[in-house]
Protein backbone atom coordinates (compact mmCIF):
# COMPACT_ATOMS: atom_id res chain seq x y z
CA UNK A 1 0.00 0.00 0.00
CA UNK A 2 1.37 3.38 -0.96
CA UNK A 3 0.26 6.39 1.04
CA UNK A 4 1.02 10.04 0.48
CA UNK A 5 2.76 11.88 3.33
CA UNK A 6 -0.58 13.51 4.17
CA UNK A 7 -2.30 10.12 4.35
CA UNK A 8 0.55 8.73 6.47
CA UNK A 9 0.16 11.62 8.91
CA UNK A 10 -3.60 11.05 9.18
CA UNK A 11 -3.10 7.32 9.73
CA UNK A 12 -0.49 7.92 12.44
CA UNK A 13 -2.78 10.43 14.14
CA UNK A 14 -5.71 8.02 14.00
CA UNK A 15 -3.59 5.28 15.57
CA UNK A 16 -2.33 7.64 18.29
CA UNK A 17 -5.93 8.58 19.12
CA UNK A 18 -6.98 4.92 19.25
CA UNK A 19 -4.07 4.08 21.55
CA UNK A 20 -4.97 7.03 23.80
CA UNK A 21 -8.60 5.87 23.97
CA UNK A 22 -7.48 2.37 24.99
CA UNK A 23 -5.33 3.85 27.74
CA UNK A 24 -8.22 6.02 28.86
CA UNK A 25 -10.48 2.96 28.97
CA UNK A 26 -7.95 1.32 31.31
CA UNK A 27 -8.35 4.28 33.67
CA UNK A 28 -5.17 6.14 32.75
CA UNK A 29 -5.11 9.91 32.44
CA UNK A 30 -3.99 11.21 29.06
CA UNK A 31 -0.85 13.26 28.53
CA UNK A 32 -0.58 16.26 26.19
CA UNK A 33 0.11 14.41 22.90
CA UNK A 34 -2.60 11.86 23.63
CA UNK A 35 -5.16 14.58 24.39
CA UNK A 36 -4.30 16.44 21.19
CA UNK A 37 -4.59 13.22 19.18
CA UNK A 38 -8.04 12.40 20.58
CA UNK A 39 -9.40 15.91 19.99
CA UNK A 40 -7.88 16.09 16.50
CA UNK A 41 -9.29 12.69 15.56
CA UNK A 42 -12.73 13.81 16.76
CA UNK A 43 -12.54 16.83 14.46
CA UNK A 44 -11.27 14.89 11.43
CA UNK A 45 -13.92 12.20 11.79
CA UNK A 46 -16.64 14.79 12.39
CA UNK A 47 -15.68 16.57 9.19
CA UNK A 48 -15.77 13.25 7.35
CA UNK A 49 -19.27 12.66 8.76
CA UNK A 50 -20.45 15.98 7.31
CA UNK A 51 -20.61 18.09 10.47
CA UNK A 52 -19.98 21.83 10.13
CA UNK A 53 -16.98 23.81 11.33
CA UNK A 54 -19.15 25.54 13.94
CA UNK A 55 -20.45 22.22 15.27
CA UNK A 56 -16.92 20.84 15.58
CA UNK A 57 -15.63 23.96 17.31
CA UNK A 58 -18.28 23.42 20.00
CA UNK A 59 -18.15 19.62 20.24
CA UNK A 60 -14.34 19.68 20.32
CA UNK A 61 -14.57 21.25 23.78
CA UNK A 62 -16.65 18.34 25.07
CA UNK A 63 -14.38 15.48 24.02
CA UNK A 64 -12.20 15.53 27.15
CA UNK A 65 -12.57 17.00 30.60
CA UNK A 66 -10.02 17.82 33.29
CA UNK A 67 -10.62 14.42 34.91
CA UNK A 68 -9.49 12.71 31.67
CA UNK A 69 -6.02 14.26 31.49
CA UNK A 70 -2.90 14.59 33.62
CA UNK A 71 -2.42 17.66 35.80
CA UNK A 72 -1.28 20.68 33.82
CA UNK A 73 -2.48 19.46 30.42
CA UNK A 74 -5.53 21.78 30.22
CA UNK A 75 -3.28 24.78 30.91
CA UNK A 76 -0.88 23.73 28.13
CA UNK A 77 -3.64 23.39 25.54
CA UNK A 78 -4.81 26.85 24.58
CA UNK A 79 -6.01 25.96 21.08
CA UNK A 80 -6.17 22.93 18.83
CA UNK A 81 -6.13 23.74 15.11
CA UNK A 82 -6.87 21.11 12.49
CA UNK A 83 -7.12 21.32 8.72
CA UNK A 84 -10.03 19.01 8.03
CA UNK A 85 -11.52 17.88 4.74
CA UNK A 86 -15.22 18.67 4.48
CA UNK A 87 -17.56 17.77 1.61
CA UNK A 88 -17.04 21.29 0.22
CA UNK A 89 -13.26 21.47 0.70
CA UNK A 90 -10.54 21.80 3.31
CA UNK A 91 -11.14 24.17 6.21
CA UNK A 92 -9.30 25.14 9.36
CA UNK A 93 -11.11 24.20 12.57
CA UNK A 94 -9.93 25.93 15.75
CA UNK A 95 -11.06 24.71 19.15
CA UNK A 96 -10.28 27.32 21.81
CA UNK A 97 -9.58 26.00 25.32
CA UNK A 98 -10.43 22.41 24.32
CA UNK A 99 -10.31 21.10 27.89
CA UNK A 100 -12.50 23.43 29.97
UniProtKB/Swiss-Prot annotation:
E.C. number: 3.5.1.5
Record keywords, A-Z: Cytoplasm, Hydrolase
First-tier enzyme category under EC: hydrolase
Functional pathway: Nitrogen metabolism; urea degradation; CO(2) and NH(3) from urea (urease route): step 1/1
Compartments reported by the entry: Cytoplasm
Record bears the keyword Repeat: no
Protein's GO biological process: urea catabolic process
UniProt GO MF annotations: nickel cation binding; urease activity
InterPro entries hit by this protein: Urease_gamma (IPR012010), Urease_gamma/gamma-beta_su (IPR002026), Urease_gamma_sf (IPR036463), Urease_subunit (IPR050069)
Catalytic activity: urea + 2 H2O + H(+) = hydrogencarbonate + 2 NH4(+)
A GO cellular component annotation in the UniProt record: cytoplasm
Family affiliation: Belongs to the urease gamma subunit family.
NCBIfam families noted in UniProt: PRK13241.1, urease_gam
Quaternary structure and partners: Heterotrimer of UreA (gamma), UreB (beta) and UreC (alpha) subunits. Three heterotrimers associate to form the active enzyme.
Protein name: Urease subunit gamma
